[in-house]
């Protein structure tokens, strides 16, 4: 009988310690950890030509770096507001850790630099290349081909976003025009002419 009382008391003390740790100590220690600060930056963008003939392929080369602390993930997005389908886009080569993702109009996307808080439907075609994780100081590159299907100005949007998105430097650029996700982009363009 005495052993049962001691055992019951020991179990009760262990449960009190466990719940105290899980309800107070662990949450406080996790909240005290400062979020990492990755710094996304696109270091180089080049287009294969300033002018192309209709039906001719345009090659976009993009290089990005994480100049901050390690990122859980960093994405480089290349958007094509003139294209309403992904048929004319392909990745030529890349050294990112994950497989690039083609995004067709109508796909649900996160927006305003949030993971899931805010979302929008894609209005135009784009491609996302990314690495998970993306270590501090690491650089990745990709070459993407797009074939414009109309004459006139063919626009390319480029941006990079690092997660956790814990400060303004986690996205690049920090200002400019907003894309379909209400995120800043750099704009590039070529003139498409009759062949």
Task: State what each model feature region is.
Residues 30-52:
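Low-complexity, acidic Ser/Thr/Pro/Gly-rich terminal tails and inter-domain linkers that flank the onset
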Residues 82-123:
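A surface/secretory-pathway sequence property marking extracellular, secreted
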Residues 131-152:
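Low-complexity, intrinsically disordered segments enriched in Ser/Thr together with acidic residues
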Residues 74-85, 159-161:
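Short acidic, flexible loop segments centered on an aromatic residue
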Residues 55-69:
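Short beta-strand elements of extracellular/lumenal beta-sandwich folds
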């Amino acid at each position: 009988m005495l052993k049962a009382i001691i055992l019951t008391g020991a179990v009760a003390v262990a449960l009190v310690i466990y719940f105290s740790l899980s309800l107070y100590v662990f949450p406080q220690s996790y909240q005290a950890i400062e979020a990492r600060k990755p710094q996304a930056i696109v270091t180089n963008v080049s287009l294969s030509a300033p002018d192309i003939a209709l039906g001719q392929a345009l090659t976009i080369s993009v290089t990005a770096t994480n100049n901050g602390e390690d990122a859980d993930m960093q994405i480089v997005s290349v958007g094509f507001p003139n294209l309403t389908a992904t048929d004319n886009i392909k990745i030529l080569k890349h050294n990112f850790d994950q497989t690039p993702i083609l995004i067709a109009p109508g796909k649900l996307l996160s927006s305003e630099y949030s993971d899931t808080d805010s979302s929008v439907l894609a209005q135009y075609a784009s491609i996302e290349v990314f690495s998970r994780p993306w270590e501090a100081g690491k650089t990745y590159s990709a070459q993407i081909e797009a074939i414009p299907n109309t004459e006139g100005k063919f626009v390319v949007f480029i941006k990079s976003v690092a997660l956790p998105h814990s400060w303004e430097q986690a996205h690049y650029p920090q200002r400019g025009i907003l894309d379909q996700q209400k995120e800043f982009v750099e704009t590039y363009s070529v003139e498409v002419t009759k062949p």
